[in-house]
Amino acid sequence: MNRRNFVKQQLAVSAVAALGPLGMYAGSSSRDAQAEKQQAGFNLKYAPHLGMFRHHAGDNPIDQLKFMADQGFTAFEDNGMKHRDKSLQEKMARTMEQNQIEMGVFVAHEISWSKPNLTSGDQDLREKFLKEIKESVEVAKRVNAKWVTVVPGFEDLRLDIQFQTAHVVESLKRAAEILEPHGIVMVLEPLNFMNHPGLFLKESPQAYQICKSVDSPSCKILFDI
């Protein structure tokens, strides 16, 4: 069976993570990679992340990106991109450009998984968040990203949900002011309470309400279902 067709069929049947053996990976020129990518013909812009193909392409991020391109992928996401060395970010950006891979989301700030931050209304925590958003603008420019993930963090059980929402909206409005001039969009990710108990943003309707309140083209929903 053709290796490339095998990847495509397995992705449609189950998930990328369930791919069977693909044989030994051999690098190819950008032109050959693009021709094979077009032949693969995915109908959707699937975006794998680093580590998914390390058993086929090795641990080097650049080799993994080239492998993704050879399999026909045209997008890539990397939650940890913000914390990678600048030189690696630049190399990854060049590799994606050469292989016509679009950079997807990366996480724009430190997510507070267990303590209230944006929900609390604490000014110092808000300024820390905004500083990280400004830093992420530079990263986004470096890697040609247009989307960054934002998670408002842990809920503040001392405050009514409406006060928490007002605090989050105010922080996001200020973040949107930073992002808008650069055409960058923060996408709010609701996370289910089973896997992420205690987080403030749990449901899509809640995210919709917040986005309507922020009222900015730089604030949308990451509808991860």
Residue ranges and their predicted role:
Residues 2-146, 173, 180, 216-222:
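N-terminal pre-domain/capping segments
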Residues 75-76, 169-225:
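Acidic/histidine-rich catalytic cores of soluble enzymes
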Residues 100, 158-161, 187, 222:
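Amphipathic, soluble alpha/beta structural segments
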